[in-house]
Curated annotation (Swiss-Prot):
Pfam families: zf-CCCH_AtC3H23. Gene3D superfamilies: 3.30.1370.210. It comes from the Eukaryota. PANTHER family: UNKEMPT FAMILY MEMBER, ZINC FINGER CCCH DOMAIN-CONTAINING PROTEIN 20. The lineage of its organism: Eukaryota, Viridiplantae, Streptophyta, Embryophyta, Tracheophyta. Residues 207-226, 334-359 are annotated as: Disordered. One of its GO terms (cellular component) is plasma membrane. This is Zinc finger CCCH domain-containing protein 20. Keywords: DNA-binding, Metal-binding, Repeat, Zinc, Zinc-finger.
Amino acid sequence: MMIGESHRGFNPTVHIPPWPLSEDLTVSDIYGSPDGGSSMMEALAELQRYLPSNEPDPDSDPDLSGPDSPIDAYTCDHFRMYEFKVRRCARGRSHDWTECPYAHPGEKARRRDPRKFHYSGTACPEFRKGCCKRGDACEFSHGVFECWLHPARYRTQPCKDGGNCRRRVCFFAHSPDQIRVLPNQSPDRVDSFDVLSPTIRRAFQFSISPSSNSPPVSPRGDSDSSCSLLSRSLGSNLGNDVVASLRNLQLNKVKSSLSSSYNNQIGGYGSGFGSPRGSVLGPGFRSLPTTPTRPGFMNIWENGLEEEPAMERVESGRELRAQLFEKLSKENCMGRIEPDPDQGAGDTPDVGWVSDLVM
């Protein structure tokens, strides 16, 4: 028999015995001690808590399950309207996008930030057909999330399921406390007068009302109050400075006008009833009025004298007093007649005090 034929008759099977665990060096550290197996299971259980899973959490309270349960930590209104599917996800590993509240590249649920892009809560008809040419510049909402998570529509209507709602992200309110009441004005028109407080609004209406009476001292009080209110509503520091400067300028003009008219009245009426010195110095030393004054004040010198030139009124000094004394002496004392001895001395006007001017 040939050697090759001897192997053709039978096929021997080799049996390898199992390696004893006591001699295995790779598991000796875990199973060598009596507590090794339990510690390994605890480590795996702790690790399982941080891995994504579709199984419900056995430790969760069934009474807390619902649309606003603590399982979803992102249920506040602000996060849902401005952060949900808007902020980019920072995770590096692959995970379930439907359970992640953040946006991912190429995700259909991605939303535009309503604080940066001005679009309404109305669904875009072109996007429903399949494609919108305007893209992110469109003024309408693209998709269900942009439409119902828009600040103008989110939780403005009650949920038909109420407390029995099991949606992970629900766009509707489940209790009266969750219903959001929208203001009357548009969110884009934050600078309108509708957002002003009732007190400021009434003050603004009173300031522009034609029946409002201005104070007698400030004839432009209504316009000043209107400008001041408008500057506060716009929040402009430059406007406040300009309004304050205009108000101070107006008050200074009013004070100057009142002071000038008061001095003219006192000077005019005092010339006939006051001391003769005041009456003599009236036409020569009267200051230039800042505003036109009414004629007709009593002054005994205005009937016989012409108005002094402007340059003469602004001059001052000893030379002016000498010229004034000479002029007064010629025009008022040349025609004076010596007193009659029979008449009393009280009828003669005393002008001796004029000599004090040249001293």
